[in-house]
A protein has these predicted regions:
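Short acidic/polar active-site loop segments enriched in Thr and Asp
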Residues: 37, 71, 113, 208, ...
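A short, acidic, flexible beta-alpha connecting loop/helix-capping segment that sits on the rim
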Residues: 266-281
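Acidic/histidine-rich catalytic cores of soluble enzymes
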Residues: 5-10, 39, 139-246
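Active-site cleft segment of glycoside hydrolase catalytic domains centered on the general acid/base Glu
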Residues: 124-139
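A short, acidic, amphipathic alpha-helical segment used as a generic capping/interface helix at domain edges
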Residues: 244-258
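Active-site groove signature of glycoside hydrolases
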Residues: 107-128, 149, 154-158, 267
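Active-site beta-loop-alpha junctions enriched in small/polar residues
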Residues: 11-14, 42-44, 77-80, 120-122, ...
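N-terminal pre-domain/capping segments
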Residues: 1-108, 130, 147, 177, ...
Length: 296
């Protein structure tokens, strides 16, 4: 694990959940100072929206990343191909495919060979089988368009459709395009109660990247006055320093590396942390991740 490239996700310093916010240039300097090999850049405002980066600004950012010694860089796109299915007259899929193509062009200009994307959240306006077909078709077109830019897409197992690792593997197999790889994470199968080693072994042939964070479960209960008692509800999942949570990353990485995985590992702080969102606490979490990975 100590040989895998380590990336810091810029969502961690984006202010998205009330934490310290840095500009994309400030963030790159931060990642370099924390001894990361590269960055995963949030491809939307306030960091890296294609709307805000013309050719000159792209060249400046590429030079900035190179000067900081950040060589392993990925763009993080945000897609939901099943969005707004109740309004068929709006070309949502076309707009999102165009967004992904714009990110592929942006990645090529920055020297970033990968763009992360998602599937879709299940929508009540269409049967599951129709949503699956829609996503397969959209992913295939996105992959073909990315290939023209010399960029490969990373599909992350995050949204509802194909969240389970077996379904995720099925989806990748059905699209069957060399420019669509797996950005397969341990987080979802860990929450599902799956065997992480088995999941990593099964997905290893498709894996080119993974994004990580660690969590603990905190029980929640709702008081029922008529019963003078509490009713359990879905636990909260709280972000904690890497290696201190319930996700068995030793098993996940051990199996992935044994199966031949050599891709990058991006650390993200995308939800409230124990200790808060001050820059010092964000830095502490990032250092803990680097130390954990480099010690193994």
């Amino acid at each position: 694990m100590s040989t895998l490239p380590l990336l810091l996700h810029s969502v961690s310093y984006s202010g998205s959940w009330g934490q310290t916010a840095l500009s994309v240039e400030q963030f790159a300097g931060k990642a370099a100072s924390l001894d990361f090999d590269g960055v995963m850049l949030m491809a939307k405002r306030p960091h890296l929206s294609p709307l805000d980066f013309d050719a000159a600004r792209r060249r400046q950012l590429r030079d900035h990343l190179a000067a900081a010694g950040l060589r392993h860089n990925v763009l993080a796109g945000y897609t939901n191909f099943t969005a707004d299915l109740e309004h068929a007259e709006v070309p949502q899929r076309e707009m999102q495919i165009h967004y992904v193509e714009a990110l592929a062009e942006l990645g090529a200009d920055l020297g970033a060979p990968y763009v992360r994307i998602f599937t879709g959240y299940e929508h009540p306006a269409a049967p599951f089988s129709a949503q699956w077909r829609l996503i397969v078709d959209a992913l295939g077109e996105c992959a073909r368009r990315a290939a023209r830019c010399g960029v490969t897409l990373l599909l992350q197992n995050h949204h509802d459709v194909a969240a389970g690792w077996e379904s995720f593997r099925d989806l990748l197999s059905e699209v069957n395009d060399p420019h669509l790889k797996a950005g397969f994470d341990a987080w979802a199968p860990a929450l599902h109660g799956d065997d992480l080693a088995a999941a990593a072994t099964a997905l290893a042939p498709w894996m080119a990247h993974t994004t990580v964070a660690d969590y603990v479960r905190r029980p929640r209960h709702r008081y029922e006055p008529a019963l003078v008692n509490y009713v359990p509800v879905t636990p909260n999942v709280q972000a904690v320093p890497f290696g201190e949570g319930f996700i068995d990353y030793r098993a996940f990485f051990g199996a992935a590396v044994q199966a031949g995985y050599t891709g990058g590992v991006a650390y993200e702080m995308c939800s409230p942390l124990l200790g808060g969102g001050a820059e010092e606490n964000l830095d502490r979490y990032a250092r803990a991740f680097v130390a954990w990975m480099r010690a193994r």
